[in-house]
């Protein structure tokens, strides 16, 4: 939500802090450690403060369809879709992926080119997802015959217009 069309300084502050807290807490939360669960509670609150003031994008639009059709938990659906959508949206994000990479705990970001820190941010998201057992792509849950419905429902979803890159 850091790079949505309506994002601004305040929403970036909330969302980047949420990314930082979630990146450091999710693994422990999955292991049911109290400090991880507490961190995730804070992270979801912070990101809620961010996206409630700037909206959401195509990741959430697509996740809604997966939840409706396959009963995929919303967080899992978002995590599966997020890296691909990050790559798609990267040309419209300026330097925001640099901030995301830093929030995800990537080291050496200050010395990276734009292409390198964008890739590092996406790779950090992929690693976090893999570490907690999230499937790497939609093939794990989506049937090919459902792609038409999923595509149509994503474009019709209220979150779609908030995407920073036209869809």
Question: What would you call each of these model-derived segments?
Answer:
Residues 45-78, 157-161:
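Glycine-rich phosphate/pyrophosphate-binding beta-alpha loops
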Residues 97, 107-167:
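C-terminal charged capping/lid subdomain of soluble metabolic enzymes
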Residues 65-104:
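Catalytic phosphate/nucleotide-handling subdomain of diverse soluble enzymes
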Residues 1-10, 95-103, 130-133:
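A glycine/threonine-rich phosphate-anchoring loop and its flanking beta-alpha core
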Residues 9-20, 56, 76, 91-94, ...:
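Alpha-helix N-cap/helix-start motif at coil-to-helix transitions, marked by capping-box chemistry
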Residues 27-39, 98-105, 109-116:
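C-terminal helix-coil-helix/basic helical segment that borders enzyme active sites and/or dimer interfaces
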């Amino acid at each position: 939500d850091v790079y949505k069309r309506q994002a601004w300084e305040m929403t970036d502050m909330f969302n980047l802090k949420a990314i930082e807290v979630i990146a450091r807490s999710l693994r422990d939360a999955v292991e049911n450690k109290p400090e991880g669960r507490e961190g995730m509670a804070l992270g979801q609150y912070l990101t809620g403060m961010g996206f409630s003031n700037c909206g959401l994008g195509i990741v959430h639009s697509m996740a809604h369809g997966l939840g409706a059709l396959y009963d995929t938990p919303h967080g899992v659906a978002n995590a599966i879709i997020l890296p691909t959508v990050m790559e798609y949206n990267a040309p419209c994000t300026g330097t925001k992926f640099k901030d995301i990479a830093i929030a995800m705990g990537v080291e050496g970001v200050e010395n990276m080119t734009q292409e390198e820190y964008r890739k590092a941010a996406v790779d950090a998201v992929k690693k976090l997802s893999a570490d907690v057992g999230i499937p790497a792509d939609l093939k794990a849950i989506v049937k090919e015959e459902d792609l038409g419905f999923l595509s149509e429902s994503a474009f019709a979803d209220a979150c779609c217009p908030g995407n920073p890159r036209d869809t």
